[in-house]
Design a protein with these regions (language model features):
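Conserved "right-hand" nucleotidyltransferase catalytic core of DNA-directed polymerases
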Residues: 1-16, 27, 34-36, 120, ...
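Cytochrome P450 core scaffold surrounding the K-helix E-X-X-R motif
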Residues: 13-17, 46-49
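Active-site-proximal helix-loop-helix substrate-binding element of RNase H-like nuclease domains
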Residues: 27-37, 41-186
Length: 338
């Protein structure tokens, strides 16, 4: 075996878009449901791990075999999730040097960063199945307990056998579509230097950055206390039920002789230059509330892994054609501005 194309379907109660794949795969309830693969471009097989099937020994061995190149669309997801599946400790991941990402290849050719989008632009015969989004929502995320579902918080294969069969077909089609993307782009290879940069990028993302969680949590707590104090001061000054309401604040200002169409940052700064008291004080308090933002600290708290490090902060080739990386989660490139 020289190459192994992989696509997996997973379950985790952690919100992937908010916490990133590293934290997502650390969730105690994380598991790989389906493992779709093709060895050396051969027939696609789907291993139903959720229903008790096991990876064939040769496939399991290939995951750590440096002689086998592993391919996936957004390979970072598969690599990190499979690292947890194989029982590697937090902070240890499968070697990115053994992986290639067809999403990076597509981006280098100016194609969309989604498998569905890339397949559509390339006009592939086997497109990504559109029903996948609903199936992922059904099987891969927690569900709300209702009378209709007997109060369960997770949908399993036995709860909808027909949907599960469709989900397996979806998984197989993803592998086929990913291989079709590779085949279509084979005449336009990515320079080896790009794959070397990709490996370095993955090592940086795997290593992450240590966070001072005491500082993070205290900053969030201080912000909450400050917002309570500022809001209380505004209520006392304006006698409004909700002084944070733009409409209520604009009406209060108008009733006190100060008309304005907007309470944007620049508009408030201009109004403060001429506003009489107590209008000036109210605008000053509102400006302080607007400045108070700890979203970056909240993002840190959401994304931090069990060992106190935040990972997956950068996406390689986040911008098509130019190849510029893109910030993710905490947006660390903005720290000097914050």
């Amino acid at each position: 075996m020289k190459t192994l194309s992989i696509d997996i379907e997973t379950y985790s109660s952690a919100p992937l878009s908010k916490c990133g794949v590293y934290k997502y795969a650390e969730s105690p309830d994380f598991e790989i449901l389906l493992f779709g693969c093709s060895a050396d471009g051969g027939p696609v097989r789907v291993v139903d791990l959720a229903c008790g099937e096991k990876l064939p020994p040769e496939i399991a061995a290939a995951l750590t075999d440096e002689a086998v190149v592993k391919w996936a669309f957004n390979a970072n997801f598969e690599r990190v999730c499979l690292s947890r599946f194989l029982g590697l400790p937090v902070g240890t991941y499968l070697d990115p040097a053994q992986w290639r990402c067809s999403m990076v290849w597509a981006a280098a050719m100016g194609l969309p960063l989604s498998l569905e989008g890339a397949g559509a632009v390339l006009g592939l015969e086997k497109q990504k199945l559109t029903e996948g989004k609903e199936l992922i929502k059904y099987f891969c995320r927690p569900c709300a307990p209702t009378k209709a579902n007997a109060g369960r918080t997770r949908n399993r294969p036995a709860h909808a056998p027909n949907k599960w069969a469709a989900f397996k077909r979806y998984n197989a089609r993803d592998v086929e579509t990913e291989m079709s993307v590779q085949e279509r782009l084979s005449k336009f290879p990515v320079p080896e230097s790009v794959w070397e940069e990709y490996q370095l990028d993955q090592e940086i993302n795997d290593r992450g950055a240590a966070l001072d969680l005491t500082l993070v949590r205290q900053a969030i707590a201080m912000d909450a206390r400050s917002r309570r104090q500022l809001t209380a001061a505004m209520k006392k000054l304006t006698e409004l039920d909700n002084p944070n309401s733009v409409q209520q604040m604009k009406r209060w200002l108008a009733e006190n002789g100060l008309e304005t169409d907007t309470l944007g940052k620049k508009a408030v700064a201009e109004l403060m230059k001429t506003a009489p008291e107590p209008l000036g004080d109210a605008l000053s308090l509102r400006q302080q509330l607007a400045k108070s933002s700890v979203r970056k600290y909240q993002a840190m708290e959401t994304a931090v892994c069990a060992d106190g490090r935040a990972r997956g902060m950068f996406q390689f080739y986040g911008a098509s054609r130019t190849g510029r990386w893109a910030g993710r989660l905490i947006q660390m490139q903005n720290l000097p501005q914050n």
